[in-house]
């Protein structure tokens, strides 16, 4: 077994080709100075590799739900398991984020409310009742017998069609205003007012019960779920929707969406979900005489910007008003909608999509400008910053801050509203859930998941938080722990958790709670990797890996890797030196004196207990306390706003200041910019100076470049391909790859020609702050700004790194650096919130030095902090506590550190060791033995399908074979239970929307509990679908990787001349102009975008400074006027004379033009002539032929780059009628064409018919063979029927065309690749993609071993090629379509795909992996399976034949019989299965023969003759051509069938795939048993009395099926992000038919019960129905009598489906001679079924039929009359073909 995780050759970011090793199930602590490479190793390498490998094995719809990580640059990875990461993402919180939404508590609550909530009418608060049909019947049943009942259905007014339909159905009366009126009076007008149709009047008694049911269901159908019942002067109204009888108001059923304030449909109509109502106090705030266009509302978005102009114009268009209308002239309704929105108002808007790079149509929900502001206020910790002057806000009076609709707010669950739960603390919520009575299983599962999530949050020290608390108001530590809680609830084993400084924000007292949670994860059997600086956490670690020795370029090496004790004793790293106190942060010898005091009173925000605190000025004050004690509430939410108010207004009622203070700098963790374009160099205002420096270089002036060209944020200098980002997102897995155009440099080539001190502008951005500080020594201003970064411990930070990728601590230090750069003379108060986040102790020392320098300058600093190194150097300490939440909010200490350690507060206890002399070393407990990992997967009370409530254990890290007869429960156990439970458990690690996608098709398994699970990968044969568009290479993503490799390092060549292609760029165009048109003039234009509105685009371009437009071969001013018609309008970029000195201007203009459009048109005036030339960026050969740019990632999957002939499919579809003459015997050529293409004209067929002399009314059966062939293939003058049908098919959807009429051939133009021909000419080492796809694994391996570039990608491809070799598919052509593979090859390809992840600690579930495999192929596949176990995985296989029994480590045998008599766990060792032993007793006399020839790339056979009326077996290794030979026999057989039907009258081809079944297919319909039984039931007296027709005895007709479950007998209960639950339909009781049908009974069974009866029972009960006895008897003979008559085909096991298929076609054979072709049909059968099959095959032969079967089982070869042994994969011929040498004939 793999006992180590090893990653070698890591070169990610600054990591220097390092190798890292650690053991599974360890807590590994990554430490080192800030910027040393810890996160690069943990997240960008280990996490990225583990996650990507596992996601690749999941369904693609799930893998694409997550933003894929790029492949890390690692040479080799061993022992990695699936990974889950928890990173610091404080700045990524959505504006609406609350504790409830972030931790998914709201999702749990919404689900429970929807499943169990009681709805109430919001106005009357009366409970709403949703009546099911059976509940209505039970209500009516309570009415005394003998009562007259009248059933009525609501009827709309003025609806003539409804009146006519009612008359047609036989209804005669309508109730209008309490008066009964004949309905025929309203035949032409409809009823004048809403009324009620009288459906039936009857006396309630037993004999009328069936009639009552019929009438009730009819009434509900007519009334769309509503009906009225009149009796004894009473009126009752029923509805299948939630309805209040008093008001008749109807409400939708409860759903999770109803309890979300973001739901467009269900949010509060007044505040539009914000929960806040903003009122306008100053009537003059809106300027009445101005219009919206003139910005009459100062708090609305500026209408002069393109964004808001577009939105407001769309709103105006939707509501029918003008933006230029003064506000006072707008109607009150329009004014209200503009300010407060309108319920359900959605407006179409065309906005720019940064992902697509163009404007796209979208829809915006219009909430109103004030409600948009309200959303920001509700979730902000500083509401005042968003509140416009002249307005005030209150809680929304309608929804009371919930943002929910009235209906949602009125709903109760266990007596409480949704808002009640939002206001509870997490501890109170947990207690409430614990007190609930036990629920049914489906509800209990949700509640247990809910409690598990709450338990983790409480264990992490957050019991005091409430779900409604906004994330923006939490401290940094609280945010980190809410994020952490989402990931720690799954009970999986073998997962690698990677945590990013989980101790952030935790007080030392709380850290032990976190440590317990992490220790529990490890003890559960997982690996935990921590990126940490907290000295306490070292006592938790099993291993320490120190990365360093320095930061940035000075780090990236493994300094130490070993136990914590060895680390302290032996390591010389900075971390170890600080831990041993060889280096330390000194306590100041003397504390700074106070310069004044800030006194804050009545602080009561959140949990603060009306505090009064005094904070000294001129000192460093640290605010500390346990988590949740109120630190952020005191400083960020109370003190900061008060100080701001005091400074602005000179007064604050709750604040007084004694001393000088004139400025406040609040440095929080908020991201200063979310754009990828915000970088440290721009933030500290140094980039402008750097750009100016480059603009002053001589080369810059030569090229005509300005300062603007050195910005990657403008099109003048930014790379046009990536827009200045340096990277682009490819369509293969959305990986972000280096831009192939600028190679990550961000800028255009001409910009990079300019150098300063031999460095380009791109080189500057790649420098770290340390490198740049030394580089700019000669530029004092730039040097000073960058040196400030180094002073604050950011020396490792690359100057061009996007700000969004920084941690919270890095952001604060960057902000502090910016503040330090501004010379401040006035006394300033600096407020910092945990600035040590992400800092090593060595960097904390530098930070303290900076803070103390501010103090020495006379400023004041307040720091919220838990780091004891900072606390010990503080001048003054405020400690809040004593606990978190409601038990916190008190001031428990306010003194110096020396005074604090004599108190008994949590901080005092933590601080004492740091003030002791000498300081104590960290406590390292003795290593304790880790609890053993569960040795087994335990399953309790498994009762899926026929499993008999079994309990069992399956060993982990072993190969377990589950054996037993077919349908004994093997598939139910392995796939329906283990796979489902594993999927559900792994999904717990993800947010609800991703979880929902993964488990939406995973039904809740019928089992009490499954423990000991790891992430699961399952491969079922029944789900092994094939896609003809996919090749062998694409199955393992080899094709995508090759595409990426060719994109990155391939060299394009011209497909015409073979010359190297040159790039079309501004430089090449300018060069061409100077070469051929010197001294001429050129006008550079770009076409107007077709999707843009003309006027808005011209206005936009005018604002950008453009002046002219070119159209109709002349120029116009861009501001008009224009003629009525403009032909091909184009924007004029520049007009310039073509001279060498104007080259810079030409380059700049062409660059700008290409940034505006993909094509540029040049209008050239030269030597008295005018010409126009159009250029597109791309590639060009020497002859001027243009090709798309091969370097662009779009080439991977973009419509414009596809082969124009086959449109990217790689094949051409043609219609072939020729082989189907017999099938269409009753058609004429015209009738066939019109039936296939009813919307197309058949007239082109007539000339062909005239030429061939075929009457247009001639049937195909009347046309001779030669004429039919000419009709299909055509003549020299006219297209044939094949070509005409192909042409018609291409004009419509190919998907709607019968697939068996379509013939697919590889596209000649693209050689089957589906892309432009020139792409084939892109080569690596002279080898093209097409050559690779036409070769095998060995060819590609040889090429890749010679490639030195992209080592990580090359290694990935090689590993997958190696896997193809290991599963025995090394011989397969990489471009071969999957559908052309044999069954064995295809299944092994699926295995290879699953095994390609290379992961450990995974459970692999395989379905009969050796079934049907040739003995020579079995060892290689068995070796791969064994290798999986060796690599520390668990493999569980189903094994029908027992072929794996001798190789398995553990055996489970289920049985003893199939179906109801199976499902028992018989033993944990396989029972020996008997092998079929039969004797062939046929005579050896000769029979007619069929001769075939085959010539393909894989097999060459000439004139193979095999006997008819005999059993022939084809055997051989996978890939030897068995299926190809069988297909050839089929084609030859079809040809013979056309010419001479006497040889055999039919051909039946059966493969190993089960019959395709819908949700309605069952045994009774498949074998045509149901019609006879329906006729019988319809003939019964009861049926006639109730007027029930034959068709009503069917669950598949509208009249007969239960209308609530549509005849399925069950309903799916959607539990949102939990697995779907399948429940019997309550209306029909699971019997599928409507209640009326259940009134007709025969032998104690109604028709629904009959469908649930076994075939044995049906055969015995209806022995007199001779027509159904044969199929029933045959099914029973084949041991399928236990199946129920209405058994759904989709619910059968694979072996049962195959047995059904065989029964239909082989055991109920045709009467005339038939050719049976069977392709590995026996591989899904157990040995007993195989014996029965052999008996039947011999019976068929004795009846004169011919059987040819592909089968490697020895018993079939031994019984065959004729044996064909195929050669090895590379032989291309037959080893043996002749009479069976082992068979002695009688």
From Swiss-Prot:
ATP 1 binds at residues 410-417. A zinc finger (C4-type) spans 719-742, 1602-1628. ATP 2 binds at residues 625-632. Residues 314-580, 590-913 form the ABC transporter domain. One of its GO terms (biological process) is SOS response. One of its GO terms (cellular component) is excinuclease repair complex. It comes from the Bacteria. Forms a heterotetramer with UvrB during the search for lesions. NCBIfam families: PRK00635.1, uvra. Belongs to the ABC transporter superfamily. UvrA family. This is UvrABC system protein A. It comes from Chlamydia trachomatis serovar D (strain ATCC VR-885 / DSM 19411 / UW-3/Cx).
């Amino acid at each position: 077994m793999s006992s180590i995780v090893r990653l070698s050759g890591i070169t990610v970011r600054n990591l220097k080709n390092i190798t890292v090793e650690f053991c599974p199930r360890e807590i590994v602590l990554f430490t080192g100075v800030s910027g040393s490479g810890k996160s690069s190793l943990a997240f960008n390498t280990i996490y990225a590799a583990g996650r990507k490998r596992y996601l690749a094995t999941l369904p693609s719809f799930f893998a694409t739900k997550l933003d894929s990580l790029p492949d890390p640059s690692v040479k080799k990875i061993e022992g990695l398991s699936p990974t889950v990461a928890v990173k610091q993402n404080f700045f990524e919180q959505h504006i609406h984020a609350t504790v409830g939404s972030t931790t998914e508590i709201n999702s749990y609550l919404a689900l429970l409310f929807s499943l169990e909530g009681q709805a109430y009418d919001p106005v009357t608060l009366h409970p709403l009742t949703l009546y099911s049909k059976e509940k209505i019947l039970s209500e009516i049943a309570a009415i005394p017998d003998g009562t007259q009942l009248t059933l009525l259905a609501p009827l709309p007014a003025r609806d003539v069609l409804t009146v006519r339909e009612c008359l047609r159905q036989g209804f005669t009366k309508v109730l209008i205003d309490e008066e009964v009126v004949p309905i025929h009076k309203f035949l032409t007008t409809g009823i004048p007012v809403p009324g009620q149709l009288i459906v039936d009047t009857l006396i309630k008694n037993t004999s009328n019960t069936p009639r009552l049911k019929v009438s009730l269901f009819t009434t509900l159908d007519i009334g769309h779920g509503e009906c009225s019942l009149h009796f004894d002067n009473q009126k009752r109204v029923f509805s299948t929707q939630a309805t209040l009888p008093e008001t008749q108001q109807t409400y939708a059923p409860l759903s999770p969406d109803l309890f979300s304030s973001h739901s467009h449909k269900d949010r509060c109509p007044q505040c539009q979900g914000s929960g806040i109502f903003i009122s306008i106090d100053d009537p003059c705030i809106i300027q009445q005489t101005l219009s919206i266009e003139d910005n009459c509302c100062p708090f609305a978005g500026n209408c002069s910007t393109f964004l808001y102009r577009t939105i407001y114009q769309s709103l105006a268009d939707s509501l029918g008003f003008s933006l230029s209308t003064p506000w006072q002239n707008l109607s009150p309704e329009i004014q209200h909608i503009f300010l407060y929105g309108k319920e359900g108002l959605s407006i179409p808007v065309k906005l720019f999509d940064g992902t697509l790079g163009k404007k796209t149509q979208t829809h915006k929900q219009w909430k109103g400008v004030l409600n948009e502001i309200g959303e920001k206020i509700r979730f902000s910790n500083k509401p005042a910053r968003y509140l416009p002057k002249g307005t005030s806000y209150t809680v929304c009076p309608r929804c009371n801050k919930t943002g929910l609709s009235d209906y949602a707010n009125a709903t109760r669950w266990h007596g409480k509203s949704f808002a009640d739960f939002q206001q509870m603390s997490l501890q109170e919520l947990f207690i409430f859930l614990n007190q609930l009575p036990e629920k049914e299983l489906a509800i209990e599962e949700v509640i247990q998941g809910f409690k598990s999530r709450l338990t983790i949050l409480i264990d992490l020290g957050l019991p005091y938080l409430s779900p409604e608390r906004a994330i923006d108001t939490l401290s940094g530590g609280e945010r980190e722990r809410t994020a952490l809680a989402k990931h720690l609830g799954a009970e999986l084993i073998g997962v690698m958790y990677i945590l990013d400084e989980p101790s952030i924000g935790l007080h030392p007292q709380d850290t032990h709670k976190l440590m317990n949670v992490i220790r529990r994860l490890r003890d559960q059997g997982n690996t935990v990797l921590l990126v940490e600086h907290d000295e306490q956490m070292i006592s938790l670690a099993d291993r320490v890996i120190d990365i360093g020795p320095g930061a940035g370029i000075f780090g990236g090496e493994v300094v130490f890797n070993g136990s914590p004790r060895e680390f302290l004793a032996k390591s010389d790293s900075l971390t170890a030196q600080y831990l041993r106190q060889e280096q330390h942060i000194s306590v100041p010898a003397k504390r700074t004196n106070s310069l004044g005091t800030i006194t804050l009173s009545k602080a009561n925000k959140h949990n603060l207990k009306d505090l009064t605190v005094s904070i000294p000025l001129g000192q460093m004050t640290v605010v500390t306390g346990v988590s949740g004690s109120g630190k952020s509430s005191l400083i960020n939410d109370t003190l900061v706003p008060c100080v701001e108010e005091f400074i602005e207004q000179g007064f604050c009622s709750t604040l007084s200041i004694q001393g000088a203070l004139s400025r406040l700098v609040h440095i929080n963790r908020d991201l200063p910019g979310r754009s990828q374009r915000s970088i440290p160099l721009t933030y500290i205002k140094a980039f402008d100076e750097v750009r100016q420096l480059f603009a002053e270089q001589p080369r810059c002036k030569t090229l005509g470049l300005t300062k603007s060209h050195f910005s990657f944020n403008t099109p003048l200098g930014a790379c046009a391909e990536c827009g200045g980002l340096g990277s682009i997102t490819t369509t293969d897995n959305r990986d972000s790859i280096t831009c192939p155009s600028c190679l990550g440099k961000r800028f255009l080539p001409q910009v990079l020609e300019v150098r300063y001190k031999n460095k380009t502008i791109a080189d500057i951005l790649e420098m770290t702050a340390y490198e740049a500080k030394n580089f700019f020594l000669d530029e004092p201003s730039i040097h000073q700004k960058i040196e400030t970064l180094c002073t604050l411990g950011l020396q490792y930070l690359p100057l061009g790194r996007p700000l969004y990728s920084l941690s919270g601590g890095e952001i604060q230090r960057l902000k502090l650096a910016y503040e330090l750069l501004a010379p401040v003379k006035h006394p300033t108060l600096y407020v910092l919130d945990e600035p040590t986040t992400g800092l090593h102790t060595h960097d904390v020392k530098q930070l303290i030095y900076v803070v103390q320098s501010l103090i020495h300058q006379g400023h004041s600093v307040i720091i919220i902090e838990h780091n004891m190194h900072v606390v010990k150097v503080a001048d003054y300490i405020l400690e809040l506590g004593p606990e978190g939440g409601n038990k916190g909010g008190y001031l428990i200490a306010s003194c110096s550190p020396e005074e604090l350690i004599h108190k008994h507060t949590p901080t005092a206890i933590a601080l004492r060791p740091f003030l002791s002399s000498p300081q104590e070393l960290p406590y390292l407990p003795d290593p304790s033995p880790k609890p053993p990992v569960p040795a087994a997967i335990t399953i309790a009370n498994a009762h899926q399908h026929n499993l008999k409530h079994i309990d069992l254990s399956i060993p982990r890290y072993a190969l377990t074979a589950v054996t037993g007869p077919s349908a004994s429960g093997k598939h139910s156990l392995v796939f329906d239970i283990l796979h489902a439970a594993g999927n559900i458990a792994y999904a717990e690690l993800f947010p609800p929307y991703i979880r929902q996608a993964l488990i939406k098709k995973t039904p809740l398994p019928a089992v009490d509990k499954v423990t000991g699970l790891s992430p699961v990968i399952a491969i079922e044969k029944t789900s092994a679908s094939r896609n003809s568009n996919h090749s062998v290479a694409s199955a393992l993503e080899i094709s995508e990787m090759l595409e990426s490799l060719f994109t990155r390092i391939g060299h394009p060549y011209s497909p015409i001349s073979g010359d190297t292609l040159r790039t079309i760029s501004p430089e090449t165009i300018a060069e061409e102009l100077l070469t051929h048109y010197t001294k001429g003039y050129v006008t550079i234009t770009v076409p107007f975008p077709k999707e843009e509105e003309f006027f808005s685009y011209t206005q936009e371009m005018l604002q950008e400074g453009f002046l002219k437009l070119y159209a109709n071969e002349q120029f116009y001013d861009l501001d008009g006027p224009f003629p009525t018609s403009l032909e091909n309008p184009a924007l004029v970029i520049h007009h310039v004379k073509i001279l060498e000195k104007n080259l810079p201007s030409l380059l700049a203009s062409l660059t700008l033009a290409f940034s505006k459009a993909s094509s540029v048109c040049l209008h050239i005036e030269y030597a008295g002539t005018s010409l126009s030339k159009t250029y597109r960026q791309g590639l060009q050969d020497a002859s001027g032929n243009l090709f798309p740019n091969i370097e662009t990632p779009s080439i991977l999957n973009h419509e414009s780059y596809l082969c124009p002939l086959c449109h990217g499919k790689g094949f051409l579809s043609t219609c072939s009628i020729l082989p189907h003459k017999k099938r269409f015997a009753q058609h004429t050529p015209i009738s066939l064409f019109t039936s296939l293409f009813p919307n197309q004209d058949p007239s082109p067929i007539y000339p062909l018919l005239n030429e061939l002399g075929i009457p247009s009314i001639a049937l195909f059966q009347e046309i001779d063979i030669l004429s039919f062939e000419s009709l299909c293939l055509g003549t020299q003058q006219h297209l044939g029927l094949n070509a005409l049908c192909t042409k018609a098919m291409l004009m419509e959807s190919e998907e709607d065309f019968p697939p068996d009429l379509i013939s697919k051939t590889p596209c000649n133009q693209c050689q089957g690749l589906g892309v432009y021909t020139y792409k084939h000419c892109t080569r690596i080492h002279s080898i093209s993609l097409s050559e690779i796809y036409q070769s095998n694994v060995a060819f590609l391996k040889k090429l890749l071993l010679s490639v030195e570039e992209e080592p990580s990608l090359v290694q990935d491809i090689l590993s997958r090629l190696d896997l193809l070799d290991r599963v025995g598919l090394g011989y397969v052509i990489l471009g071969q379509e999957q559908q052309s593979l044999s069954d064995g090859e295809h299944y092994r390809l699926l295995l290879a795909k699953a095994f390609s992840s290379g992961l450990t600690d995974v459970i692999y579930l395989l379905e009969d992996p050796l079934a049907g495999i040739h003995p020579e192929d079995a060892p290689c596949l068995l070796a791969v399976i064994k290798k999986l176990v060796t690599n520390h995985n668990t493999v569980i296989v189903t094994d029908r034949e027992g072929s794996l029994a001798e190789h398995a480590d553990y055996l489970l045998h289920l049985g003893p019989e199939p179906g109801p008599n199976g499902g028992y766990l018989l033993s944990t060792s396989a029972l020996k299965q008997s092998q079929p032993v039969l004797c062939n007793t046929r005579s050896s006399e000769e029979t007619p023969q069929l001769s075939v020839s085959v010539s393909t790339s894989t097999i060459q056979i000439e004139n193979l003759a095999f006997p008819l009326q005999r059993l022939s077996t084809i055997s051989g290794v996978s890939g030897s051509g068995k299926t190809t030979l069988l297909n050839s026999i089929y084609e030859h057989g079809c040809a013979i069938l056309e010419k001479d039907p006497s040889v055999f009258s039919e051909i039946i081809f059966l493969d190993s795939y089960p019959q395709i079944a819908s949700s309605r297919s069952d045994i009774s319909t498949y074998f045509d048993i149901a019609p006879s039984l329906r006729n019988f039931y319809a003939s019964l007296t009861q049926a006639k009395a109730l007027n029930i027709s034959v068709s009503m005895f069917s669950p598949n007709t509208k009249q007969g099926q239960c209308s609530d479950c549509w005849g399925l007998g069950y309903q799916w209960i959607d539990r949102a992000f939990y697995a779907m639950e399948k429940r019997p339909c309550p209306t029909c009781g699971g019997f599928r038919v409507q209640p009326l049908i259940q009134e007709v009974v025969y032998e104690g069974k109604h028709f629904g019960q009959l469908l649930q009866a076994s075939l044995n029972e049906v055969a015995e009960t209806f022995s007199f129905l001779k027509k159904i006895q044969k199929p029933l008897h045959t099914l029973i003979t084949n041991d399928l009598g236990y199946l129920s008559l209405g058994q759904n085909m989709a619910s059968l096991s694979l072996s049962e489906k195959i047995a059904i298929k065989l029964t239909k076609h082989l055991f109920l054979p045709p009467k005339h001679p038939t050719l049976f072709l069977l392709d590995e049909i026996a591989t899904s059968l157990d040995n007993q079924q195989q014996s029965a099959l052999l008996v039947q095959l011999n019976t068929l032969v004795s009846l004169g039929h011919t059987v040819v079967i592909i089968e490697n089982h020895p018993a079939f070869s031994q019984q065959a009359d004729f044996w064909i042994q195929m050669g090895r994969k590379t032989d291309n011929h037959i080893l043996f073909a002749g009479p069976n040498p082992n068979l002695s004939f009688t």
